[in-house]
Curated annotation (Swiss-Prot):
Family as reported in the entry's similarity comment: Belongs to the small GTPase superfamily. Rab family.
The protein's role, per its UniProt record: The small GTPases Rab are key regulators of intracellular membrane trafficking, from the formation of transport vesicles to their fusion with membranes. Rabs cycle between an inactive GDP-bound form and an active GTP-bound form that is able to recruit to membranes different sets of downstream effectors directly responsible for vesicle formation, movement, tethering and fusion. RAB18 is required for the localization of ZFYVE1 to lipid droplets and for its function in mediating the formation of endoplasmic reticulum-lipid droplets (ER-LD) contacts.
The encoding gene: Rab18
Listed transmembrane segments: none
Protein name (record): Ras-related protein Rab-18
Assembly with partners or alone: Interacts (in GTP-bound form) with ZFYVE1. Interacts with ZW10 and this interaction is enhanced in the presence of ZFYVE1. Interacts with BSCL2.
Activity-regulation annotation: Regulated by guanine nucleotide exchange factors (GEFs) which promote the exchange of bound GDP for free GTP. Regulated by GTPase activating proteins (GAPs) which increase the GTP hydrolysis activity at the ER membrane. Inhibited by GDP dissociation inhibitors (GDIs) which prevent Rab-GDP dissociation.
Modified residues (Phosphoserine): 144
Highest taxon of the lineage: Eukaryota
Amino acid sequence: MDEDVLTTLKILIIGESGVGKSSLLLRFTDDTFDPELAATIGVDFKVKTISVDGNKAKLAIWDTAGQERFRTLTPSYYRGAQGVILVYDVTRRDTFVKLDNWLNELETYCTRNDIVNMLVGNKIDKENREVDRNEGLKFARKHSMLFIEASAKTCDGVQCAFEELVEKIIQTPGLWESENQNKGVKLSPREESHGGGACGGYCSVL
């Protein structure tokens, strides 16, 4: 059934409680939005297969609770991850200020040095913005992260965030190939231009 799947990737979604991590995941996997979505208790987990530049990848996406009382789950949660989506709420500056704490945690527990990180400023559909787009971009550049602003409510930027993350992982030698070396898998020729396609207006590849 999965013969044409290039690889399976472990993706994490992290960030403060209430920034919309679960809503982003639900929009990406099920294309739905629930404004009354309850806070995640512990860890949620979803699987979705996507195609990027002609390469099919199965994503095992882990969504964690942002609350401090669930941090005991942290070490096993980070283990073996190839990509991380770090989310903040553009209408809550405190969630942006605390990004450094999440990066420190990532550095402490992540088992790979070449993990690909994507910074997502969520809830751009709201008017009471407290974090400017350029602030997010500057933070992402400082920490060598991909960056995008998105809205789980309107779907803006959501698909692009996951596609760009997966594309970057597939382009990173050693992140996924070792488990596939004996399967004879080959990359499809990737598109040379990062600026084209549906994501051109959103993502900054850093």
